[in-house]
Amino acid sequence: MYLIVSTLILLFLLISISYKINIVQYEIKSEKIDREMNILFLSDLHSCDYGINQKKLMDKIKSVDCDVILLGGDIVDDKLKPKKAFELLEQLQQLGKKVYYVHGNHEKRIENLDEIDKAIKNYGVQILDNEEEFLSNNIKLIGVDDSSGEILDDYENELDILDDNLNSENFNICLIHKPDYYFKKNLKKFDLMISGHTHGGQWRLPFIFNGIISPGQGLFPKYAGGIYNDDYTLIVSRGLAKEKTVVPRIFNRPEINLIKLTNINNS
């Protein structure tokens, strides 16, 4: 009996705990999209190790065709050394793609963040701190800095102003670490929000619940990972954290995301 139970437990662990990187793809259609574009999104690496020069991760990245790369925060961890994060940035630089980065809450906790940011920029990465960039004539990316360490009322007032000043004729993309301001409704005029932070709710049970716990959302979070369409579209990545996490990821493989933007009239 003991052998049977032990075997069943071992089988469960082998099936449920996997750190093989998943590529999750989404297609977003809008009449405001003026050119087809593939966006690669990575979030929540937390300076974790995917082999020498992040080979396991880079093999996945190189297997997809993308036009631009977005990094959604917590790429550099506040506890682990930044070496593995910098290895990733160095490898991304060699791809020759434009790379944009927003801070997450763990980067905002780093005491020498100015030095870390300088190193990030040396890899050709553009950090967006409540700043915007056009990815095409009509596709605008707005990178929003994380709220950690900020006075919350002032921060949310800035978000309201940013939201009010959007040009609705553009296809507006919000790159922000936490998805909280999607359901808090501070940012409600975008066409697409791309976030991470949740680590996929840590534990999942497919077809039953999508995550057990997430910071900012508590137990059984609605926005733990996937695509959502309430007022507009939200994509939440389950991210790449592994050895940094206190508990193992169960039925919750680390992931990167390929987001295809297409004009609705071309489909």
Predicted features by range, described:
Residues M1-D34:
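N-terminal membrane-anchoring alpha-helices
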Residues S16-S18, G216-G218, P248-R249:
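Short Gly/Pro-enriched turn/cap motifs at secondary-structure boundaries
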Residues S18, L45-Y50, V76-L80, S147-D153, ...:
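Short, flexible loop segments at the rims of nucleotide/cofactor-binding pockets, characterized by
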Residues K29-S30, K55-V64, Y181-N186:
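Short amphipathic alpha-helices and their capping/turn segments at secondary-structure boundaries
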Residues K32, L45-S47, E107-L192, T198, ...:
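Conserved catalytic scaffold of divalent metal-dependent phosphoesterases
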Residues R35-L128, F134:
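Membrane-embedded segments
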Residues G200-P206:
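His/Asp/Glu-enriched short active-site or ligand-binding loop at hydrolase and phosphoryl-transfer sites
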Residues P206-L219:
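Short, surface-exposed loop/helix-turn segments at secondary-structure junctions
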